[in-house]
Amino acid sequence: MNYLDIIQDREIVAILGQIDILKQADCKYFGILHTLSTIEFAKQLSKCFDLTDEEENLLLIACALHNIGHLNGKNLHAQTGAEMAKVYLTKHGMDIKDVNIIGNAISSHLGRRNDNFYDSVSACLILADKMDFGSTRIKPNFEEMSFEDEVLRHITKVNVSRTGDVVELMLGGIDVDWKVFVQSSAYAKLYRCFETVCKKYNYSFVVRVKKVN
């Protein structure tokens, strides 16, 4: 099973469609477009995090299912979605070990605890999810989404060339202890991604994260 099987499954398409209808008044998109955009960011992050093909497949499946819990309301949607995903994946014959990895990623995708980032699949889902909500997207063609473009947009927006600032701005929705987070392997890998983009476009590269004083 892969993410394409899931996003083409009538059951999942129906759930995401219902979520889009339920969330119309929120001016946010938790359904189909957000799911597809999150998948696109995750594909790029999987390369930054050096995920194996197997890990990338699990990540993209987690992306495809990460918000299905919104069908039962926003509160606790991460936990509800994780349980729904486990039932769905088990029903379709997925190995229990892989089911648990995906379930853990979905349950922790809000990124509210530093230990949510210890697992690479979970970390990539959190980052991809937050990058989509931090992007310029207002119902665009999801294929136009670009991790590189978002890094550059944030650099231009705040008129800074300090990668640490851009990391914080792009991931502002992550409610973690930044003093701890900047010491984590997830931050180190993300930092490397930003460094690559900055150097490609000749931005000076100086680390400064405002929340860490």
Which residues fall in each region the model found?
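Alpha-helical scaffold segments in carbohydrate-active enzymes
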Residues: F41-Q44, A105, K130, C193
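Divalent metal-dependent catalytic cores for phosphoryl transfer on phosphate-bearing substrates
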Residues: C48-S161
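Generic detector of well-ordered alpha-helical segments enriched in charged/polar residues
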Residues: L4-D5, V13-D20, G103, S107, ...
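Terminal helices and disordered tails flanking the catalytic cores of nucleotide-processing hydrolases
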Residues: S135-N213
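Acidic/His-rich, divalent-metal-binding segments that scaffold phosphate/diphosphate chemistry
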Residues: M1-L76
